[in-house]
């Protein structure tokens, strides 16, 4: 009888411990995406604030030179990829 009470107590304690570990793991997983998104947007804002001396793809090139690998379209005045059919 005592052995059965001890095994029931250990089983119950194990289930409680399992519940606590799962709850802690789940709460950490809920915070992870929020932290990841906030860090991504923080990095994105740093790049937006950076001023460039050249114009990137599909940017207006009237007052600026296009970045390397792009040419200024004579028709649209945008920086585009160089191609044989573009003059």
Swiss-Prot record:
GO molecular function term, any single one: toxin activity
Signal peptide annotation: 1-24
Propeptide: 25-52
Location of the protein in the cell: Secreted
One Gene Ontology cellular component: extracellular region
Tissue distribution: Expressed by the venom gland.
PROSITE patterns tied to this protein: HWTX_1 (PS60021)
Taxonomy, superkingdom: Eukaryota
Pfam families reported in the protein's UniProt record: Toxin_12
Keywords (A to Z) from UniProt: Disulfide bond, Ion channel impairing toxin, Knottin, Secreted, Signal, Toxin
Keyword presence, Secreted: yes
Cystine pairs: 54-67, 61-72, 66-79
Function: Ion channel inhibitor.
Family membership noted in the UniProt record: Belongs to the neurotoxin 10 (Hwtx-1) family. 51 (Hntx-8) subfamily. Hntx-8 sub-subfamily.
Domain notes: The presence of a 'disulfide through disulfide knot' structurally defines this protein as a knottin.
Protein's recorded name: U3-theraphotoxin-Hhn1l
Source organism per UniProt: Cyriopagopus hainanus (Chinese bird spider)
